[in-house]
Amino acid sequence: MSISRRMFRIMIGLALVGLFAPLLAACGPVAPAAPAEIVLGTALPLTGGQAREGGYFKKGYELAIKEINDAGGVMVKEYNKKIPIKLILYDDKSDNTTSVQLYEKLVNEDKVHALLGGYGTPLISSHTVAPEKYQVPYVNGGGATGEIYARNMKYIFGMLASIEKLAHTLMDWMAAQQDAGKLKKPVKIAVVGENTSHGKEFRKGVQDKTKAAPDRFQVVIDEPFELNLKDADQLLQKVKGANADVFLADARIADYTTIHRRYTEMGLSHLIVSYGPRGTEKAARDALGAAADYIVSCNWWSADIPTQEAKAFAEKYQKAYNEPAEWFHALAYETARVMAKAIETAGTLDKVKVRDALAKTDMKNSLVVGGRVWFEANGQINNDYVMMQNLPGGKLGLIYPKTVATTEAVVPIPKK
């Protein structure tokens, strides 16, 4: 080939590059190949002592993920497309050791992009070491004790305000009843709680408020009990002997049902009865019948909160499962949505960037109390509680705070 012909071809090549370069530049960089799915993982107590609550969380997670996937998935800017979510879900059998092992498996074998929490303070306290150790972003809606968030963890986020705040809210409401002339001062309190960090934090919250206002409150008995209580007689004999005006307890659904059934059989009565966040659950009310009337609950959510978001979720949950929504379902649903939103905000599946997006979460129009999700520096939300009271005929009234109240509290409980 002659030099002139070779030069001619080189010149043609350069001309073509010059012609198409602007077009290629206009198209921007080519997005990397997207994964087929965003893989989220969780381990829930689907059998064992916490099986009922674990099943509630399963339904909430699955409803949120179906809704996201029906809309095409999560938009991830790095790949310039929506990617559907795949949820890997294991049964931890309500066992702490199994829960830790399963979260290790989700990270090391299943190679999840992010993690959703289980249910119950003991389980969550145990298994959160795995996401922190491997630096995998994690959000839970089933663990409220401050102990979980006091360990300087950077990858752990929680959707439930603290149990200490729950106890303080309950005591503030009782003070309001005193100011309204419905409750005497000082009022004598019997407080019991499960022998876990959950129950200890509840009892401490009651004691702290008592020490701060001795003119209002006097604790006459402060007693722990073992989780999964089989016989409440000994515990309630102590409560009976204390001659308290108010009975406050912190218990899981099964223990609440056991304790209050025996409470009723013994003919006990107090001006106010509360089992902390328990009392309004349909399963418990069905089991206890009219004995559950007038119990006061301090909780993280209610379908009766007067917001569009709460109403919309209650309706979609009822349609999906043909049963009423409770806080377990709502918080699980919102937990999954918060994780999806963090991935979308990060615009990538990079775990550090998703973690950073979670830390900066400011999600408006949420169904949580107050309508906003954000996390404090320790990773825990700090929104308000809503207080409810069981009313005769299976009805429920929101009683506190005034911004959401639908009825006045019945205090004292009517004598039967």
Predicted feature locations:
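Beta-alpha junction/loop-to-helix N-cap segments that form part of ligand/metal-binding clefts
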Residues: 29-31, 52-57, 74-150, 159, ...
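Sec-exported extracytoplasmic/periplasmic mature domains
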Residues: 62-73, 104-112, 128-136, 175-179, ...
